[in-house]
């Protein structure tokens, strides 16, 4: 009771818009720094342990507050070159102020924390995070909204909890070719004074630009506009863009005239070049269209897949389910050794892309099943289809409990779990443990340098 009263008292001492000084003690899961002001917890994005900061309080809750950096009084030695970068300098890249070795250190700490607290495993050994070969310019897909600033067309990112665009001249994560194309496109659009979409009035043409690139330094351009039809003027400007940048192999115009935050329209019209660009992973050629799901950091994705497959005891001639398969990337790699792969994916276009890729690569022992994993897995079992093991790669929300129940019911010896959210991964590990399974191996993989995001690959085995 006394602690609660003390917290309330300290809480009342702070007000929104207060400017205070604080020293950061640690980085918590999610990537924000944590410090204490008169014993009251304050979370600060883009801050690092040993930073001494002047911050502005932006929100206050019962047990904590949040603030943004106004000034760095003394920079942590882990800041890049000790420069005093603040939140706005690397908007959208919440670890970019950290030296890369420190990014890896804190990502490991975050994984250890959730495994210890949520999964309840205090003694599991977590090896060093697998570093990315490319720590800048690794993204093969970028989407930026258009806006207007000082009578000039700009692109960038939405500011935190707002639809105001923060201008980015050169995105440090985007491929160099992607940055080059966006810069050239903005110059062309500004010369021709094309109107920009205003979500309040629902008027204006330009909504978003999407660039997809591949390892061969080829690009697909998708211009999203607020219209039900293509104008000749817009087409001419995009053809001009292609004349200036020969690496562009495909151009689409996406028609999106709805009052929505969804980026891509329902109608994507090819106006130049190929329907897709191609990417090669493990000697399998994948087609990438405007709506295709594909790993953002291809070099690191190859390494992640190799780790996941190596975790299996033996996949030769086995019947394997690739659950949440997307376009079936890892399923097709596994199919080279396995007897049969069932690739289950709820997004129909992803399943269709996978079927096309498998056919073009002569992979006949993979079957794409369009539907929810929890339902389709039951159907496979009810149809007496043999299942030796499963590889999971679910969305951030993790697995449905019914899926974990089904794994236990099948008495599978092992499953491999790829996760983009260590918190839900840890939760599911605990649920598996209640069904007689144990987390045997765990490898964290840095798919997204300069951000706090971290992926994990785990081997979950049935207890003997």
Curated annotation (Swiss-Prot):
Keywords: Methyltransferase, S-adenosyl-L-methionine, Transferase. One of its GO terms (biological process) is rRNA base methylation. S-adenosyl-L-methionine binds at residues 295, 324, 345, 393. InterPro entries: MeTrfase_TrmA_AS, MeTrfase_TrmA_CS, NA-bd_OB-fold, SAM-dependent_MTases_sf, TRAM_dom, U5_MeTrfase_fam. One of its GO terms (molecular function) is rRNA (uridine-C5-)-methyltransferase activity. The active site is at 420 (nucleophile). The keyword Transferase applies. Its EC number is 2.1.1.-. PROSITE patterns: SAM_MT_RNA_M5U (PS51687), TRAM (PS50926), TRMA_1 (PS01230), TRMA_2 (PS01231). Transmembrane segments: none annotated. Gene3D superfamilies: 2.40.50.1070, Nucleic acid-binding proteins (2.40.50.140), Vaccinia Virus protein VP39 (3.40.50.150). Residues 13-71 form the TRAM domain. It comes from the Bacteria. Belongs to the class I-like SAM-binding methyltransferase superfamily. RNA M5U methyltransferase family. This is Uncharacterized RNA methyltransferase FN1713. It comes from Fusobacterium nucleatum subsp. nucleatum (strain ATCC 25586 / DSM 15643 / BCRC 10681 / CIP 101130 / JCM 8532 / KCTC 2640 / LMG 13131 / VPI 4355). The lineage of its organism: Bacteria, Fusobacteriati, Fusobacteriota, Fusobacteriia, Fusobacteriales.
């Amino acid at each position: 009771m006394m602690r609660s009263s003390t917290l309330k008292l300290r809480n009342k001492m702070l007000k929104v818009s207060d400017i205070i000084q604080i020293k950061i003690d640690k980085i918590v899961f999610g990537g924000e720094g944590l410090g204490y002001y008169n014993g009251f917890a304050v979370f600060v994005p883009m801050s690092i342990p040993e930073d001494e900061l002047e911050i502005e309080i932006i929100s206050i809750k019962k047990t904590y507050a949040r603030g943004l950096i106004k000034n760095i009084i003394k920079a942590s030695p882990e800041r890049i070159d000790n420069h005093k970068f603040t939140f706005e300098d690397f908007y959208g890249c919440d670890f970019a102020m950290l030296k890369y070795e420190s990014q890896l250190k804190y990502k490991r700490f975050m994984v250890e924390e959730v495994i210890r607290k949520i999964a309840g495993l205090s003694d599991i050994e977590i090896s060093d995070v697998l570093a990315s070969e490319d720590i800048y310019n690794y993204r093969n897909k970028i989407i930026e909204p258009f806006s207007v600033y000082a009578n000039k067309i700009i692109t960038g990112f939405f500011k935190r909890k707002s639809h105001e665009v923060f201008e980015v001249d050169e995105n440090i994560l985007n491929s160099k070719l992607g940055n080059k194309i966006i810069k050239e496109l903005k110059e062309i659009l500004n010369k021709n004074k094309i109107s920009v979409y205003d979500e309040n009035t629902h008027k204006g043409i330009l909504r978003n630009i999407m660039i997809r690139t591949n390892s061969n330094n080829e690009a697909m351009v998708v211009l999203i506009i607020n219209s039900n039809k293509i104008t000749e003027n817009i087409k001419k400007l995009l053809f001009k863009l292609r004349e200036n940048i020969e690496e562009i192999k495909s151009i689409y115009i996406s028609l999106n005239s709805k009052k929505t935050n969804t980026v891509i329209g329902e109608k994507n019209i090819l106006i130049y070049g190929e329907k897709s660009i191609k990417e090669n992973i493990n000697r399998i050629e994948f087609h990438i269209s405007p709506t295709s799901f594909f790993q953002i950091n291809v070099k690191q994705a190859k390494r992640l897949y190799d780790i996941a497959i190596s975790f299996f005891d033996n996949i030769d001639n086995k019947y394997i389910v690739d659950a949440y398969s997307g376009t079936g990337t890892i399923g097709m790699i596994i199919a080279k050794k396995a007897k049969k792969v069932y690739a289950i994916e709820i997004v129909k276009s992803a399943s269709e892309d996978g079927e096309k890729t498998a056919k073009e690569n002569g992979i006949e022992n993979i079957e794409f099943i369009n539907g929810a994993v929890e339902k389709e897995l039951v159907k496979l079992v009810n149809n007496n289809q043999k299942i030796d093991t499963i590889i999971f790669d679910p969305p951030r929300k993790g697995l449905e409990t019914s899926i974990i129940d089904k794994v236990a019911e099948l008495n599978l010896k092992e499953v491999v779990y790829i996760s983009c959210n260590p918190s839900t991964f840890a939760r599911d590990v605990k649920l598996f443990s209640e069904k007689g399974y144990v987390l045997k191996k765990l490898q964290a993989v840095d798919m997204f340098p300069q951000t706090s995001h971290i992926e994990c690959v785990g081997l979950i085995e049935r207890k003997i």
